[in-house]
């Protein structure tokens, strides 16, 4: 039995459940090592079962150990039979499912108690092991190099889409298996939109260019943002940029295990507020990364939780002035026993090309 399943069973016992159904495919991968488009896991104290279809039987045998493997397209009927044979009554399930799937579950487990579980596996995924850290670190290094190469590619007249495509293709050339999300590439006024879509707009001299991008390596993500300037930069642009950079660096300097989620957000936000731009920082400071680009933990001013060693997090302060421009600087960091390790190493001093 692997360590992840052991941790799963401990948490399940704390919730007084007899078994749990997992059908989020990334959670299935996390627990079993199997990556595919069809897979459902049932875990109880005495049996751990993976149900998939015949297309994946060879792959499952190669990628998974410690699980019973069943090839059947009616996974709920298979699991219901196991539950009945074992005499189990309290069954948990992931709560992010469709209404139609929930109705199927009610029919398959008629007469049993079903208990929705929020972020059950995602809570375990918050703390990364060495293999996960290695994959995230590699994804970050690919993103770093793609950004450095993009600095030579970007010229006046290149469109946002052309620059975004360059980043995307370059990350694949460097070994990425895919993108962790659709690249955000925003220039000029568009950079005031935190999640702008790249357009057929040419970049022009004097504009800010914000690039938010990342890649996949062994299923794990990177997530990085850099803002640069084309040709020249105004005093106001430089002031705003350096304020965001100061906020970003302050969190890197102070992030450590035991820091409250509220303080994780407050440290950089206070710097932006003190500079007079508090109303222009309109999103959270960061989130966890791993198999998903946005995953636990999330940060808010009401949370009482604390940072823990092994968390991989983003640090992404920004200032966005509607009708003018915006700045965001985003790094990926790993919480260590002595503080934090910066995973994204691409330059972030004020860059004018």
Task: Please report, for each region that a protein language model flagged, where it lies by residue.
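Active-site neighborhoods and metal-handling regions in enzymes and metal-associated proteins
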Residues: 1-353
